[in-house]
Structure formats: structure tokens, C-alpha cells
Amino acid sequence: MKKQRTKKILKSIETIKKEIEKHFEKLEKEINEKEEIPARYHIKEIDKSLLNFLEKRLNLLKTDKSPVEQYKKRLNTLRQKADSQFN
């Protein structure tokens, strides 16, 4: 893979990670404020969109997928917290 292409992919990975962190911050805030609908939105956005995109980018570089696994564990913990709080 060309260096320039690799550099762009690495930059996009960092951007995705920042976006995931923003959604995690918002999710934690919504759970603490007992806002179910926005919290569910952030869970879905992280799970269905951002993590898939990150995983695809990591696959392109054939690198370690541990960041995706760490984010999934963190998301599952927050999802369980939300489920117990909203149900």
C-alpha cells in the first residue's frame, strides 16, 4: 500500500477514535441525566456505525483490532448500565 494512502487511513482512524470518544462522553452524560432516547441514539451510533467503520479501516492496514474490542467492552458496560437504569 502506498505511503500516502496509509497516512490517510491512519488519519481517518484517529478521527474515528475521536468521534467515538465524543459519543462515549455524550452517552455517559445522557445516562447520568436519565435521558433514554439520546442515550440509545449514542449506543446505536457507536455500535452500528463508528465501530464498523473503525474495524474496516484497521482491516485495510492489517493491524491489531484490539481498539475495537476495547470499545466494544466499554460500550457493553455502558449499555448494561443504561438498560438497568431505563428498565
Task: Label each region the model flagged.
Residues M1, T15-I16, E33-K34, E45, ...:
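Alpha-helical protein-protein interaction elements
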Residues M1-E21, E30-N32:
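Short, charge/polar-rich alpha-helical segments
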Residues I9, I16, H23, A39-H42, ...:
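Amphipathic coiled-coil alpha-helices
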Residues E14, E21, E25-E28, L51, ...:
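Alpha-helical oligomerization interfaces characterized by heptad or quasi-heptad repeats on one helix face
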Residues E45-K72, Q80-N87:
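Amphipathic alpha-helical coiled-coil segments
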